[in-house]
Every structure is written in structure tokens, then in C-alpha cells.
Amino acid sequence: MDTNNTNNINSLENPIDLENDPNILFTELNVKLESLITFLTKNDKDNQIFVDEIIDNKVTDLLIASKELENYFISQQSKYSAEKNKIQLKQEIYKVKKEIENKDRLIERYKNKVKEWKYHFEPLYQSQNHILHSTAQGLSGIENQFSPVFTPMPNTPSILQNLSQAKPSPSLGLGSTIL
């Protein structure tokens, strides 16, 4: 019984490094299971008095070892989740970076097109502008044939006023009106 207590104290004093090796946890769990099975199958008369107490200790040891293993798996799962989130974030950043690069290339391409169009159409525009201004100066004494013809706007309030006046309706009788 003293060796069991010493083993329990040693296992509690030497915490298992969960970061390094899960095999240690599996080995410890396996040893404790073997110890429990050996104890249960052993038929020693001297130990029959303490059977309940020893079984409780063995089961407690087994539960502690399984809890340590469970904690290890939980820590691994949280690490995996954190790594997964980092990878997803990196993928999203990469995707946005590619979109920006594509848009920058598109902007550069259209910027070059605008320059090309400007070099092509600017001389035409300047020559047409020069012709237009020289023609307008030559025709300053004559009525400008390029000026727009003035079209009077209808008097909108008087039209609305005429439409809103009451008029007799032949179908409704002499005194009726339609607005």
C-alpha cells in the first residue's frame, strides 16, 4: 500500500508536459489500467480488507490520467482552431491583395488608354476649335448662323389657369362643372 501512495505522490509531483508528447499520457493511462486489472484479478487474502479503498484509489488515478489526456486534446483542439483562423485570415488577406493588384493593373491599362486617346483626339479638337473660332470672328458682322434660334417658352401658369376653370359639361347638365 505504501508503494501505491508513493506512486500517487510521485505522479502528482511530476506534472506531465502536455506540450511535448501525448504518448506519455497514453502510456500512463495504460499502466494505471493494467494495475487496476491486475489488482482486481488478484485473489490475495491479505488485501481483501482494503479492497474497497484500493479500488477507489485506482479508479481515482485512472480518472486523473484520463482527465489529463482530455485536457491535452482540448489544448490541441484550441491550437488547431487558432491555426485554422490564422490560415483563413491569411487567405482572405491574400485574396484582397490579389483583387487590389488586379484593379491596379486595370487602372494602369485605362490610364494608358486615356493617354492614347488624348494624343489621338487632342490635335483634332484643337484644329476644330481653331476653325470654329476663326469662322466666328469672320462672321461677326453677319448674323451668326451657328447661334441657336430662340424659342419662346409657353406661359405655363396661364395654361394651368385655363385648365382649372369651371366649364359646363354637356353630358352632366347645365349647372354642372368639371375641374
Swiss-Prot record:
Transmembrane segments: none annotated. This is Putative mediator of RNA polymerase II transcription subunit 28. Component of the Mediator complex, a coactivator involved in the regulated transcription of nearly all RNA polymerase II-dependent genes. Mediator functions as a bridge to convey information from gene-specific regulatory proteins to the basal RNA polymerase II transcription machinery. Mediator is recruited to promoters by direct interactions with regulatory proteins and serves as a scaffold for the assembly of a functional preinitiation complex with RNA polymerase II and the general transcription factors. The lineage of its organism: Eukaryota, Amoebozoa, Evosea, Eumycetozoa, Dictyostelia. GO terms for molecular function: transcription coregulator activity. The keyword NAD does not apply. GO terms for biological process: transcription by RNA polymerase II. GO terms for cellular component: mediator complex. Pfam families: Med28. Belongs to the Mediator complex subunit 28 family. Residues 81-119 form a coiled coil. Keywords: Activator, Coiled coil, Nucleus, Transcription, Transcription regulation. It is found in: Nucleus. Component of the Mediator complex. InterPro entries: Mediator_Med28. It comes from the Eukaryota.
